């Protein structure tokens, strides 16, 4: 994982002691990066599919039955619920909670938590109905 702090003279790397846990029936595409956890574990739960070029940062937890399209990036310590679908090239900021059954449109930038069953898109990502209304 990517973990540094500055001591005013130089940058110092702190060790990551967590592990990566990959559940059953998980598919991981080509050129993915999955960082080990810093103080806790990085987890990809059962029946989740990662397309190519997905980055999963330290301490991320991805739930069951998720489908993640190519070039999605998860910043550290974000929790993704079960049955979540994320379109290609979406970016998910760190320390967020994404609820169960959420759908995130491709190219979206998620900078806030998303409640369960919501559908979002855009940057910043917002409810799809609000996005369409504001972008006509």
What role is predicted for each listed range?
Residues 1-127:
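Structural signal for interior beta-strand "rungs" in well-ordered beta-sheet cores
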Residues 132-136:
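Long, leucine- and charge-enriched amphipathic alpha-helices
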């Amino acid at each position: 994982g990517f973990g540094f702090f500055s001591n005013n003279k130089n940058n110092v790397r702190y060790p990551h002691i967590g592990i990566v846990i990959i559940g059953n029936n998980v598919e991981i595409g080509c050129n993915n990066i999955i960082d080990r956890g810093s103080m806790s574990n990085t987890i990809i739960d059962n029946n989740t599919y990662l397309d190519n070029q997905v980055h999963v940062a330290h301490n991320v937890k991805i739930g069951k039955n998720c489908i993640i399209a190519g070039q999605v990036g998860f910043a550290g310590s974000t929790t993704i619920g079960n049955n979540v679908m994320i379109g290609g090239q979406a970016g998910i900021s760190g320390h967020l909670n994404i609820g169960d059954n959420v759908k995130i449109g491709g190219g979206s930038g998620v900078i806030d938590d998303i409640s369960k069953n919501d559908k979002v898109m855009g940057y910043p990502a917002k409810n799809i109905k609000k996005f369409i209304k504001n972008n006509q």
